[in-house]
Amino acid sequence: VIPGSESRVDAVDGGTVQLTINSDLQWYMQQMIAEEAQAQGAKGGTVTVVEVGTGKIRAAAEWPTMDPNDLDASSPETWTSKLFTYPFEPGSTFKAVTAAAVMENAGVTMTSPTVSASSHEKFENGAVINDAFVHPTFQYTLAGALIDSSNVALSKFGTMVSPDVRHDYLERFGVGETTVGFPSETSGAVSYTHLRAHETGRNL
């Protein structure tokens, strides 16, 4: 380019990007998680709304967060998304993995057999499992265990399949893998050597 002259390059249209986020729902979730986290005295909180039939993320809110137009007003810790870059424990959603494994490999149905489970039990390897509420010993069907979200009962159902089967189902359900391809997204970790029949999801 000769000094003092101009060089013109016509713009090229970019691609089309369409978010799955519902803006109204996103705004509401953002307000809700901020209010609830502060009301509970929590250091932070996240909430994700996923459309079950498609897997589309309709809202992904967290607190504390930052204003991209005013980074100086926020802590560097808020400059990334904890929703995608921090690993988290699957919790009671993990019970679906256990249920699928025993139904397809151990002949378990929603109504038979039953397992005897109290709200607090110690397993053979020393692990102690508790339910969220205190209750006497119940004879749980798989359906009942899922309805009550019983950690103890689901752990007992989980002993009906081998560690190899459990590990296979973890992989088939995508546990320990990235999801949406977000920059720096973590995949989490699933250790086969530490896989135990009574894990309910809190220890992964």
Predicted regions and their residues:
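Mobile, glycine-rich extracellular loop/lid and propeptide segments
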Residues: 48
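Extracytoplasmic/periplasmic proteins that interact with beta-lactams or build/remodel peptidoglycan
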Residues: 1-43, 66-69, 77-78
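Beta-lactam-recognizing serine transpeptidase/beta-lactamase-like catalytic domain environment
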Residues: 2-5, 21, 51-92, 97-202
